[in-house]
């Protein structure tokens, strides 16, 4: 501990989300970056709170103003941030619909959400049917520009579309120019529409830089909920640190497809922080991006 540090002691369990150095054995960080962890919690469970659950929590509570009973739509509901959204939304007493492939529907249902098979059904039409034409109060979309346009159609008056990734760029299903046009609509054109709907893009690192105390408070809340036994993240796999490089290449989507419905425990390192940009980041720790567009947007705090 540094000479000016107070409120912490050697041996205390603390959590942080370093942008660089997350795989090292020892790391020097600013004392005001760390959040104390409740005594006795599984450190692997605590890891889950830092990225996936904080992302989900801040989108649900900071980006949106949701009330118990409100309906939301979660894309990629079987993924890391997706399952965090499902569990936290259940705690907030929200009605949840989640798009996922059929192999993940039991996992989605285990969180009390209604699955939508995006491969064999039009999710826009399904939301219209399930909500009797009312739409949902919020959509959380990690897919990308083309999907944002369709998701916006699902938003009810007074609701919000929150983009937080661009997965289809990494799979080649969407071009970079198409994604940038999607950003233009998400952050510009749709905000000018007088239709009572709103849109935004969420990035955990840029928000943390701008609002560090908010970030610490939110992580502390999640750690407390974890310590109280209110949160039980879905498990993909836990790997030793020495296998971290191999873990980065692991097909995360397939891992979640193989989860036993209702299984509970830590996601841990093997979760791989896949959804900082919907899977567009090759390594959050090294800052290596798969597409120049994502690096450009990240550097500008998007």
Task: Describe every region a protein language model picked out.
Residues 13-76:
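NAD(P)H dinucleotide-binding glycine-rich loop of Rossmann-like/cofactor-binding domains
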Residues 53-121:
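Mid-domain Rossmann-like dinucleotide-binding core that forms the NAD(H)/NADP(H) cofactor-binding site
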Residues 146-230:
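Glycine-rich phosphate-binding loop and adjacent beta-alpha segment
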């Amino acid at each position: 501990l540094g000479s000016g540090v107070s409120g912490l002691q050697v041996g205390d369990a603390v959590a942080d989300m370093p942008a660089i150095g997350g795989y090292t054995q020892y790391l020097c960080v600013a004392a005001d970056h760390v959040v104390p962890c409740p005594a006795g919690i599984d450190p692997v469970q605590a890891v889950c709170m830092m990225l996936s659950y904080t992302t989900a929590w801040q989108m649900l509570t900071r980006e949106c103003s949701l009330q118990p009973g409100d309906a939301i739509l979660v894309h990629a509901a079987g993924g890391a941030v997706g399952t965090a959204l499902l569990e936290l939304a259940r705690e907030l007493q929200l009605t949840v619909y989640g798009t996922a492939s059929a192999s993940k529907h039991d996992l989605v249902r285990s969180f009390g959400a209604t699955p939508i098979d995006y491969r064999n059904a039009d999710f826009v039409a399904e939301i219209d049917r399930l909500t009797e034409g009312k739409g949902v109060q919020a959509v959380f979309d990690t897919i990308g520009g083309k999907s944002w346009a369709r998701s916006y159609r699902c938003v009810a008056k007074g609701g919000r579309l929150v983009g937080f990734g661009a997965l289809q760029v990494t799979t080649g299903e969407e071009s970079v120019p198409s994604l940038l046009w999607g950003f233009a609509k998400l952050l510009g054109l749709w905000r000018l529409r007088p239709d009572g709907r709103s849109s935004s893009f969420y990035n955990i690192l840029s928000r943390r830089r701008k609002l560090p105390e908010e970030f610490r408070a939110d992580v502390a809340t999640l750690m407390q909920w974890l310590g109280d036994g209110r949160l039980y993240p879905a498990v993909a796999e836990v790997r030793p640190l020495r296998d971290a490089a191999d873990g980065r290449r692991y097909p995360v989507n397939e891992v979640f497809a193989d989860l036993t419905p209702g299984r509970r425990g830590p996601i841990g390192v093997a979760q791989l922080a896949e959804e900082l940009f919907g899977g567009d980041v090759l390594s959050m720790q090294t800052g290596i991006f798969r597409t120049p567009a994502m690096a450009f947007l990240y550097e500008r705090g998007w």
